[in-house]
Amino acid sequence: MTTTLQQRSTANVWDRFCEWITSTENRIYIGWFGVLMIPTLVSAIACFVIAFIAAPPVDIDGIREPVAGSLLYGNNIISGAVVPSSNAIGLHFYPIWEAASLDEWLYNGGPYQLVIFHFLIGVACYLGREWELSYRLGMRPWICVAFSAPVAAATAVFLIYPIGQGSFSDGMPLGISGTFNFMIVFQAEHNILMHPFHMLGVAGVFGGSLFSAMHGSLVTSSLVRETTETESQNYGYKFGQEEETYNIVAAHGYFGRLIFQYASFNNSRSLHFFLAAWPVIGIWFTALGVSTMAFNLNGFNFNQSIIDSQGRVIGTWADVINRANLGMEVMHERNAHNFPLDLAAGDVAPVALTAPPING
């Protein structure tokens, strides 16, 4: 009689699971960060879609005046949003089990917290997953460093700013018009357009767009001819080919003569590092600016800075912006305040520039 011994396969289930999770041969890399990223992002997306379509109105200001944000309550794609949780909740963690009923949870904007917390964990894990895959493949880690800019921006508007202001009702709504409302109120309360870190962010985003267009057009204009006039130039490139597909010397010569010699990169590596670093650093600064303005360290105030010899104010664009800020502030949350804080606490401000008397 022959006796055979068979090793139990269950002893290696964990090892095979680990190998599958960390395998770079999968069509889509999962990784250990992906183990947390996938369920959190799926939860955030599912709750966002359901809330955007069907969530009942939310008492965002905590004054029993609900704001409707979902499609089924009369909104469209532009006006719809997942409305932030109620000011009555403040900074309290508000999961479903903390509410007395599902209706109460919906009325107080519980879905907003569910979405942003899962979303922030998910995008942080996506950043970690980028590093993890780079590590497995022996690549340098700069991809995740670049992605840290949008992660920092999202963290600033969804987490840091509400913490600084004392309530998640001050977080950015999850919708198009809600985002615009957030921007307008942010300008009214913090004068973000006059903050140097926001200016750096504008330079980063607009400059990055300009440099991207310049680089793409230069490369496309200096391709090595591999096709005839009747063929698409895209057929002149084969994936993985060793030869350069464009002439960097020609591109450098063109741009150096168009502007001046040292305005043009002669090193492809430093050029592409610059293209990545410029917008990333700009967005880092904007996220840092929002995080400081969260605690009311606001933009520059040049209101009524110029006066004549008689002490009369000579209006500047700073005064025009200040007047616009006051108008936006008095109009937002108009039923939540008896009197706007800036107007109640500050000096008397004229509502119009002094006009000269009319003789006639």
Curated annotation (Swiss-Prot):
Location relative to the cell: Cellular thylakoid membrane
Residue sites binding Fe cation per the record: 215, 272
Cofactor details (free text): The D1/D2 heterodimer binds P680, chlorophylls that are the primary electron donor of PSII, and subsequent electron acceptors. It shares a non-heme iron and each subunit binds pheophytin, quinone, additional chlorophylls, carotenoids and lipids. D1 provides most of the ligands for the Mn4-Ca-O5 cluster of the oxygen-evolving complex (OEC). There is also a Cl(-1) ion associated with D1 and D2, which is required for oxygen evolution. The PSII complex binds additional chlorophylls, carotenoids and specific lipids.
Cleavage, annotated site positions: 344-345
Residues that, per the record, bind chlorophyll a ChlzD1: 118
Annotated binding of [CaMn4O5] cluster, by residue: 170, 189, 332-333, 342, 344
Note: Cyanobacteria usually contain more than 2 copies of the psbA gene. 2 of the reaction center chlorophylls (ChlD1 and ChlD2) are entirely coordinated by water.
Descriptive protein name: Photosystem II protein D1
